[in-house]
Regions:
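Phosphate/NTP-binding elements of NTP-utilizing enzymes
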Residues: 2-358, 366
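Metal-dependent catalytic core segments for phosphate chemistry
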Residues: 363-379
Length: 379
């Protein structure tokens, strides 16, 4: 099959520059980096349009929808094609191996993430030219890990081409053509030892409190036999603070801002830039790039209006639809509102040694010693 040399990264960037598509600051920085490579400004890596389009052609021709319009061709959105081209199309000029081996994607719910990952897993199993590929779809619980896996298996059932090469077994998908396997795994599996994944798919990492599962899978990808392993984490925001989600989010932010160097780490963080934007319909696309096509705009409008009238529902919308951090599912202040990192001098605030304030129902006592705040005591 002929591979067209479409450049979806450049097309997306053009729409961003013209204002046709609005993106958040983190996506803008990611796109700047990708365009810089495409422009030939990187001595080590370049954009290969044939390699970039291979997974897109595979998915749109051989992966069929397993929900809704069952059996119909799966057509990818522009932002999904951009993600795939960035992962598979930016390669080393000499070895032609992929630049990125770890990808972190944060996106609002109902933007097709499970469908994209399940199709990508099938590509990794059959279309990526990997010998003995091992696709491990992991989560904290096996039932959660099977969400993406079951979607992949249903795609195989709907596709005559995939059925020809991929067999559905009790606990996995098996490809006799290249001795490949696609399997769901979890931290409560009997063992995670002896794995040799060519691709790891970690879904909904916001729910992971213990980072052990992430660490085990990262270590499993260290085998010399895998020249370009791929670790993909995809998630919405969540309520667990200081977990692996926060760590990956902060690390991605550091890489984007230049505070950390990691040429093999790529992120696509779709989010609102500020809390105020949740009430502005024109900004919703920042966290929901599939709005109006994959995700229902009327339904999102309905949820936002309900959240305005129901305080307990508001954190769910802010966190899951717009990827704004919240402390808990029932919190009424967002992480953005609570997390004030502004610095100040004690002299500017306190004129006496002891000062008491009544703040949100709690008495806070501050003590000034040597021009610094020495202690904060909450009563």
């Amino acid at each position: 099959m002929e591979i067209k040399k479409y450049n979806y990264i450049a097309r997306y960037w053009k729409k961003i520059q013209s204002g046709e598509i609005e993106v958040c600051s983190k996506i803008y920085k990611t796109m700047e980096q990708l365009i810089n490579i495409q422009s030939g400004n990187d001595d080590k890596y370049h954009f290969d349009p044939v390699l970039a389009n291979r997974p897109i052609v595979f998915i749109e021709n051989f992966c069929k929808q397993s929900k809704g319009n069952v059996g119909a061709a799966l057509k990818l959105e522009l932002f999904q094609k951009v993600i795939l081209q960035a992962i598979y199309g930016i390669v080393d000029r000499k070895t032609h191996l992929r630049k990125y081996t770890e990808v972190f994607i944060c996106i609002g719910r109902k933007n097709g993430k499970s469908t994209l990952l399940s199709a990508l897993g099938n590509y990794g199993l059959l279309g990526d030219k990997e010998g003995g590929p091992e696709i491990d779809c992991v989560s904290t619980k096996r039932d959660a890990a099977k969400i993406v896996f079951n979607a992949a298996r249903d795609m195989v059932k709907q596709s005559p081409y995939l059925r020809k090469y991929i067999k559905s077994r009790k606990s996995d998908l098996y490809c006799e053509y290249n001795l490949g396997v696609y399997q769901p795994l979890s931290s409560d599996s009997n063992t995670l030892d002896g794995l040799n994944p060519s691709m790891v798919i970690l879904d909904e990492c916001h729910a992971i409190k213990d980072r052990n599962l992430y660490d085990v899978m990262k270590q499993a990808m260290a085998a010399e036999s895998r020249k370009q392993p791929l670790f993909i984490t995809i998630t919405t925001s969540g309520y667990n603070r200081e977990g692996i989600y926060d760590e990956l989010y902060d690390y991605a932010s550091d890489v984007l801002e230049g505070r950390a160097e990691d040429e093999h780490f790529l992120s696509f963080i779709f989010e609102l830039d500020s809390l105020e934007e949740w009430d502005d319909e024109s900004k919703w696309i920042k966290a929901n790039p599939g709005i109006g096509t994959i995700k229902s705009l009327p339904k999102l409008k309905e949820n936002v209006e309900r959240a305005k009238k129901t305080p307990d529902f508001k954190p769910t919308v802010l966190t899951k639809d717009f990827n704004l951090k919240n402390i808990s599912a029932s919190s009424w202040l967002s992480w953005e509102e609570l997390n004030n990192e502004e610095l100040f001098e004690a002299d500017e605030v306190f004129d006496v040694c002891w000062t008491e304030y009544l703040t949100i129902g709690a008495k806070i006592r501050y003590r000034k010693i040597f021009d610094q705040i020495n202690s904060i005591e909450a009563k």
